[in-house]
Amino acid sequence: MNLQRFPRYPLTFGPTPIQPLKRLSAHLGGKVELYAKREDCNSGLAFGGNKTRKLEYLVPDALAQGADTLVSIGGVQSNQTRQVAAVAAHLGMKCVLVQEHWVNYEDPVYDRVGNIQLSRMMGADVRLVADGFDIGIRRSWEEAMESVRQAGGKPYPIPAGCSEHPLGGLGFVGFAEEVRAQEAELGFRFDYVVVCSVTGSTQAGMVVGFAADGRADRVIGIDASAKPEQTREQITRIARHTAELVGLGRDIVERDVVLDTRYGGPEYGLPSDGTLEAIRLCARLEGMLTDPVYEGKSMHGMIDKVRLGEFEPGSKVLYAHLGGAPALSAYNGIFRNG
């Protein structure tokens, strides 16, 4: 497997820290050791997050093409678009962001605080669109790229989650390689890695990266899309493409992709009572903030799996914290009392 042949533009601080979650582990009975790998602390660019790791492999391609405008898409409170806006500002490029109405949540300030506020502060051209949530290529995004061309610019397309981009899975192949190096320092291997999945390239990259040492099916995706079959198809397709890119040396098969579908409801972007409990529990025991859209759902999944005995006693479980806390202010009605 050869990731090094792909150019990478440094946007992160380096390897992200692995933090033991001692109080949460003890609260859940102490039979399973929980750790978090803090992708939410990976960069000085507008709080970073998992998309910043992915963008390190897209930026060289954008620069090689002579692009002057990064064009991306997400929901109103998209973490992806905030990270793209930050990278554009860092590079001195223009940025156009399509923000669709992906979440059926009404709050007077929902489109004025959190991620979208930060994107505007960084100079992005933010375009609100009424279209609802789905996975895949969106017409509104294609129209935004055409508008840049019509104005004489040269757009560089960055799809939702970087996931439909041919290089979108590479960053999290690197995540797996990074974890292996950290395991050598720690003196043990993780038995499971828990990660939130929606558009698929984060888990897909991990599946490929951990397939190199036989742990592909130990990557436990927690679906947050509430459209799990679409998400599963994307993860599998992206993983197969990425495996070919890096020369994994074996095919990705269906059993490599593990996606737990119990925690995505009630729908994309709306938290269940279990998700809200997980968000508050993690915050109050560890001072670690998770959000109602993504990380709260994957945290809910991990906590529930520990409680249900789905991790063997003595297991060491690594929670991939992908970011998302900047969206919390958009849900102030839910968290007004903490």
From Swiss-Prot:
InterPro entries: ACCD_DCysDesulf, ACP_carboxylate_deaminase, ACP_carboxylate_deaminase_bac, TrpB-like_PALP, TrpB-like_PALP_sf. Pfam families: PALP. Its cofactor is pyridoxal 5'-phosphate. The keyword ATP-binding does not apply. The active site is at S78 (nucleophile). GO terms for molecular function: 1-aminocyclopropane-1-carboxylate deaminase activity; D-cysteine desulfhydrase activity; pyridoxal phosphate binding. Its EC number is 3.5.99.7. Keywords: Hydrolase, Pyridoxal phosphate. It comes from the Bacteria. It catalyses: 1-aminocyclopropane-1-carboxylate + H2O = 2-oxobutanoate + NH4(+). One of its GO terms (biological process) is amine catabolic process. The modification N6-(pyridoxal phosphate)lysine is found at K51. Gene3D superfamilies: 3.40.50.1100. Belongs to the ACC deaminase/D-cysteine desulfhydrase family. Homotrimer. Catalyzes a cyclopropane ring-opening reaction, the irreversible conversion of 1-aminocyclopropane-1-carboxylate (ACC) to ammonia and alpha-ketobutyrate. Allows growth on ACC as a nitrogen source. PANTHER family: 1-AMINOCYCLOPROPANE-1-CARBOXYLATE DEAMINASE-RELATED (PTHR43780:SF2). HAMAP family: ACC_deaminase (MF_00807). This is 1-aminocyclopropane-1-carboxylate deaminase. It comes from Burkholderia cenocepacia (strain ATCC BAA-245 / DSM 16553 / LMG 16656 / NCTC 13227 / J2315 / CF5610).
